[in-house]
């Protein structure tokens, strides 16, 4: 007797070309096909590896130096990866030695800056390795054209989002943007998140931050992320706030679904 159970055709199969999401996986009897099971296990392994991948800060600093950008290497209060994962609060503050180094830098460079750019490994150093330099290339070119000033790029080992508040406060920056590896998903182990804050200081909650997420080749493009961040910077300085009271209403150009050309506006607000 032939015990082979064929995998039936799935009418949704064509939709898989439009999304990396796990849809139209098919079935063999009442189970998933072997290929889908193996793909899931592989994606799960990639996500776990992304969380534990060491932060190659030396390589990133060298790349920044090659582009003519100064950088500072700091460490959070979390001593290692294990403590970082177990104690999120320690990842939100700088180690005292790092905080003192920033104070000395600020004293040697008085006057403050418009923006402090902070880069932390977060939960995916892979995202930071892949996307930090390409994004900064697009963003800093446009920011310089608009006249914004910035401090040396600050790299924080074992850092979480809120550590940028302390960095910005110590540097006297009007604004901070944190580039951090987001929690890996099963289809996105390398998503970079941008967290923007106006008037940073220790103790701010997430309500005072704006998030631009999923910056990667398969997600939000570097150019669009830079466009949205610059919009937030301009509006934050004009209105002197950030977070839930500052909505992203940046105009974006998209292709009309009827192929009649381009249109502008925020599609989330039904404009254009």
Swiss-Prot record:
Cofactor: adenosylcob(III)alamin
One Gene Ontology cellular component: ethanolamine degradation polyhedral organelle
UniProt-annotated location(s): Bacterial microcompartment
Catalyzed reaction equations: ethanolamine = acetaldehyde + NH4(+)
Cofactor: binding comment: Binds between the large and small subunits.
Presence of keyword Phosphoprotein: no
GO terms classed as biological process: amino acid metabolic process; ethanolamine catabolic process
Stored InterPro entries: EutC (IPR009246), EutC_C (IPR042251), EutC_N (IPR042255)
Keyword Lyase included in the entry's annotation: yes
Alphabetical list of Pfam families matching this protein: EutC
Entry binding sites for adenosylcob(III)alamin: 161, 182, 211
Gene Ontology MF terms in the entry: cobalamin binding; ethanolamine ammonia-lyase activity
EC number from the UniProt entry: 4.3.1.7
Annotated keywords: Bacterial microcompartment, Cobalamin, Cobalt, Lyase
Pathway assignment: Amine and polyamine degradation; ethanolamine degradation
Enzyme class: lyase
Source superkingdom: Bacteria
Family to which this protein belongs: Belongs to the EutC family.
Function according to Swiss-Prot or TrEMBL: Catalyzes the deamination of various vicinal amino-alcohols to oxo compounds. Allows this organism to utilize ethanolamine as the sole source of nitrogen and carbon in the presence of external vitamin B12.
NCBIfam families (UniProt xref): PRK05465.1
Subunit and interaction comment: The basic unit is a heterodimer which dimerizes to form tetramers. The heterotetramers trimerize; 6 large subunits form a core ring with 6 small subunits projecting outwards.
Name this protein carries in UniProt: Ethanolamine ammonia-lyase small subunit
Gene source species: Pseudomonas entomophila (strain L48)
Lineage, uppermost ranks: Bacteria, Pseudomonadati, Pseudomonadota, Gammaproteobacteria, Pseudomonadales
Gene transcribed to yield this protein: eutC
